[in-house]
Amino acid sequence: MEWITVPEKGFTLREVRTLTNRNVNLSEDLEKSVSAILEKVRDGGDAAIRELTKKFDGVELSDFRVTEEEMQEALAQVTPEFLEVLKEAKANIETFHKEQVRKSWTKNFRDGVELGEQFLPIQRVGVYVPGGRAAYPSTVLMDTVPALVAGCPSVAMTTPPGKDGKVNPNILAAAYVAGVKEIYKVGGAQGIAMLAYGTESVEPVFKIVGPGNAFVAMAKRLVFGTVGIDMIAGPSEVCCVADGSADPIWIAADLLSQAEHDPRAAVFLITPDADFGKKVEVEMERQMKELSRYEIMKSSVDDYAKAFLCRDAAQCFDIVNKIAPEHLEVELPDPKQYLPLIYNAGAIFLGKYTSEPLGDYMAGPNHTLPTSGTAAFSSPLGVYDFVKHSSVEMYNKEAFQKISKKVQIFAKAEGLTAHAHAMEVRDED
């Protein structure tokens, strides 16, 4: 873990970005490779999906949609205990996200002028669920339940197949609990292309959400405009603000819970107490050796772990706001008092019993969060990502007559005479 002492004047945003090195590096070579995959699927459809799945996943698929038989086979492999946990998690996620639902509205703003907004679910969305180092049934729930709460009538999910040509049973069990019925065994950039462009057997979607590897991130970036996307997700990150009142064993465990995701996952400890920070560092080294994903955690901690030694709480949260972390834990006495100091964080966990994994699985708020500093301008996935709104405007004759001349003056000032003409012809009524 690299130690950084924050000077009295603090660091600038540019300095913090340099120190933390959280840029999502999507190279030109990667762009070329992904562009070729997208073009192949767009032009080749189902045949291209089969060819690319064989090439990248080593699996030959005649039909890449999950069948009811495969779903039932998967459910038979899942323990009843895990199925109940999935159901409880789904209920918590659903309850939380129902609070985000917006209702359409109209209001009489002036005599004869009715204005409003109409909120409508996106009619068809695609959800990408990653495979790779681990299977994430939690991501299935987090990314599909808000879409269903929003009222999206069509949700298509895709995820990479295993070497046996099947989807991980836990992934399918989560989809079953969520209520998703359209599931495909297609991963990587080709999965994104399938959702964006459609094939002979797959209807295209209007928006794609969900995290993935660099190929998936690049594919989402390149199809944006053809479809909407939620975000470009980078490696996971956690930031913990803590002092000597916290337990270094607990803090170390929380930091490692994110380090195990990816060799490029970042962990940040921000503290005014150097002795406490050193205890956390020692604990991280000890605990890593006892956990199964040691090599991944070791790479993350060696390359992307930073400890910022600050002068006081105000300086701690100044650094937090410049990092704009995906996950932020605050383990200081009376942690709620610091909320007004926090501007930039994807998810905020207050107090020593609010360990970050609660948010990953069971609490209810979404765990698909902005990474790489993007929490400074973006938000967690939610119902609002699956809804669009249209403005609604209605004038009666009297209201039109009051405003018509002013619109004509405005239009002519911009040189748009046809706009003015559209008003003039109604003046004669």
At which residue positions do the language-model features occur?
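Short acidic-hydrophobic, aromatic-tinged amphipathic segments that line or gate anion-handling sites
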Residues: E2-K9, E182-G187, A307-D312
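Alpha-helix C-terminal capping segments
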Residues: M142-P153, Y176-A178, A196-V202, K220-L222, ...
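C-terminal core of ALDH-fold dehydrogenases
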Residues: K322-D429
